[in-house]
């Protein structure tokens, strides 16, 4: 058990930016508005530029109201605000550049974590801190691993594989396309590989319905795809302009999960929105944008009881999202993480992965180096947070 460590989280935003922020300044630059700041967030993780922009914004004349997600990114991901949180148990992830992304769990409490930086999937048993390279980098043609999802009924670990070598991802693996990979959940042996349609697809996250169909978000296109149990390829399940990636670049669709109402819910990463896909007779009948507090780079979305989800925001928080009709409410469970990317629930614990992906995308190394070792954190869920 010596590898299980207790850590103080001493990074990330010190407050939850649930309300709009106000920036004051002098009288020389009245033409700069928060829309310009917001536009700068439409590139995937451009925190350095946003920091410069926020400094410039402090010289603007009148009071300028900026959405929380702009300020949270600049302050949270650049670690310019420090806070000390209560101690959390953590487990380190070996390596200098694993950049852990998605995390999923099985009924025995085992965790499976996809690695963007060096590829492969690691399995961790939190009770003993036993860590195993479950899928080796490059195995079964795989490249950078994004979303992972454990399908125990079919003995399959599904994983999103993307060729990110140009960004510093693994050189191992022969696939050049974005693909959904299926590995044996007991042995890690590759079973299935299904390419996403189109030349510029990006498999991000995964969920399943009760009939065994697999759904994935395509972050490069405004499309949710579905793979039926007996199908050999994907079909389009839903498409909407509202899912479109920003014109300036960056991720569109990201998190995906079924709610207790039987409908499908998705997030958009850069724009920061939450949608419900109303399902009728197995098809997406309507796409509804839900209204609520601003979201700062919403990533993984996981079911969490009746009409609720767990959600991680890239600005540093683990939230509970409660759906009420066409609106949602946010309750922050824990803040202060370094660019969290995913969450998996095991009984009364939420395991949060810190991806620190801004360092992965910073090819010029202007931001320095990520905090090592990479970690996953155990966040206790109180009775009041579950329902």
Specify the residue positions occupied by each region the protein language model found:
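Short loop/turn segments that connect beta-strands within beta-propeller blades
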Residues: 125-129, 184-189, 228-232, 278-283, ...
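Beta-propeller blade signature
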Residues: 175-185, 368-383
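Beta-rich, blade/repeat-based domains predominating
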Residues: 94-108, 116, 139-156, 160-163, ...
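Short linear motifs in low-complexity or flexible loops
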Residues: 5, 10-16, 22-23, 27-35, ...
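Structural signal for beta-propeller blades
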Residues: 119-122, 166-167, 180, 222-225, ...
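Asp-box/WD-like beta-propeller blade repeats and closely related beta-sheet repeat scaffolds
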Residues: 171-211
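A short beta-strand motif characteristic of beta-propeller blades
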Residues: 87-93, 130-138, 189-196, 235-247, ...
């Amino acid at each position: 058990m010596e590898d299980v460590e207790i850590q103080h989280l001493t990074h990330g935003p010190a407050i939850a930016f649930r309300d709009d922020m106000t920036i004051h300044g002098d009288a020389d630059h009245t033409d700069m508005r928060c829309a310009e700041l917001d536009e700068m967030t439409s590139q995937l993780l451009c925190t350095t530029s946003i920091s410069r922009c926020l400094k410039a914004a402090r010289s603007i004349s009148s009071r300028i109201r900026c959405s929380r997600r702009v300020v949270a990114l600049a302050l949270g991901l650049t670690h310019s605000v420090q806070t000390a949180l209560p101690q959390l148990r953590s487990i380190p992830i070996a390596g200098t550049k694993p950049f852990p992304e998605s995390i999923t769990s099985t009924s025995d409490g085992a965790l499976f974590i996809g690695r963007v930086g060096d590829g492969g999937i690691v399995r961790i048993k939190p009770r003993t801190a036993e860590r195993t390279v479950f899928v080796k980098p490059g195995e079964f043609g795989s490249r950078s691993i994004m979303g992972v999802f454990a399908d125990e009924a079919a003995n399959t670990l599904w994983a999103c594989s993307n060729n990110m070598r140009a960004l510093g991802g693994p050189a191992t693996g022969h696939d050049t396309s974005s693909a959904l990979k299926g590995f044996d959940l007991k042995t890690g042996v590759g079973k299935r590989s299904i390419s996403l349609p189109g030349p510029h697809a990006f498999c991000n996250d995964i969920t399943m319905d009760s009939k065994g169909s697999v759904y994935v978000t395509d972050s490069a296109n405004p499309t949710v795809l579905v793979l039926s149990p007996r199908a050999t390829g994907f079909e389009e399940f839903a498409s909407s302009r509202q899912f479109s990636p920003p014109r300036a670049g960056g991720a569109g669709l990201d998190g995906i999960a079924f709610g207790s109402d039987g409908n499908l819910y998705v997030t958009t990463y850069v724009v920061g929105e939450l949608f419900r896909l109303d399902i009728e007779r197995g098809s997406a009948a309507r796409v509804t944008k839900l209204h609520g507090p601003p979201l700062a780079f919403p990533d993984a979305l996981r079911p969490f009881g009746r009409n609720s989800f767990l959600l991680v925001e890239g600005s540093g928080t683990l939230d509970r999202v409660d759906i009420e009709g066409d609106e949602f409410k946010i309750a922050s469970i824990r803040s202060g993480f370094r660019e969290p990317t995913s969450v998996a629930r095991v009984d009364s614990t939420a395991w949060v992965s810190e991806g620190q992906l801004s360092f992965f995308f910073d090819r010029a190394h202007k931001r320095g180096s990520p905090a090592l070792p990479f970690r996953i954190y155990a966040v206790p869920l109180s009775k009041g947070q579950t329902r």
